[in-house]
Every structure is written in C-alpha cells, then in structure tokens.
Amino acid sequence: NILFIEKNSGIPIFLKNGRFGEYTEFDGFNKASKLPPEDKPKNPKVSYYNPHELDYENSDTKLFVLRSLRILGFHPENKRPIGIKIRKPGKAFKFVKFIKCGDVEVECPNDFYKLEEEEQDKLVKKAFSIDQFQKL
C-alpha cells in the first residue's frame, strides 16, 4: 500500500504489515505505527501516529512521516534518502546507530541527536564524502 511518493527521490513510502503489526517503509528505513496509550500519558520521546488518520496530500504530514523515519536529507547525486538506522547487533541489549544512504551504512555516535546541527552535518558529509546534502 503506497502512502505517497517522496518528491525529491521519486521513491514511494509504503505502509506494510509485518510480524509485529503495521509499519511505514521508505528505502530501507522503517517505523512501526504507534498509537498513543489510552491508560497513561504520552511519552514525549515517542512519535505516535496512526497512518490511517493522516492526510498525505499535506506537505507537513509528509515531512512528519519522513522525520518519524529518521530521514535527515537526500544525497546530492543519487537523490537517495540519508537517515539514521538503529540496529541491535546480536543478542546484545545495546542499540547501535548508523548513518545510512542506499546500501552504505556508517556507524555514528549514539548521542547523534544531542549533537549540534553543524556537528551532525559534518558527520553526514564525512560518511558519504560529500560537500553538501539536501536537508529536510
């Protein structure tokens, strides 16, 4: 089920159904659909959304979905999305963050989102040997 086609890359964003329920998928980045809890307050660190209640014609909604998928921007040459992929290697309890674009993944600091925007940009540019990238 295609939710919308991202305008910069021309790549579709899908709503898929997996082993643990619905999730949104975009070029290797994915995000589980999360509904807010009914019996307790929302966690401010979690981006809740019900994909069936969003207006995908609205550019703010599209931006919200891309940010929920941890997309940072787009590669200047191949137009593929650049974003953060979080993976749990093996049976370890620790999660590892990677900056990803296409098939290339480069490990990045776990505190990536706490870094200043300028420092984040430097890491992305260094990871893919680029001078600039189109940010969201």
Segments predicted by a language model, with ranges:
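Basic, low-complexity terminal or inter-domain segments flanking catalytic cores
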Residues: 1-136
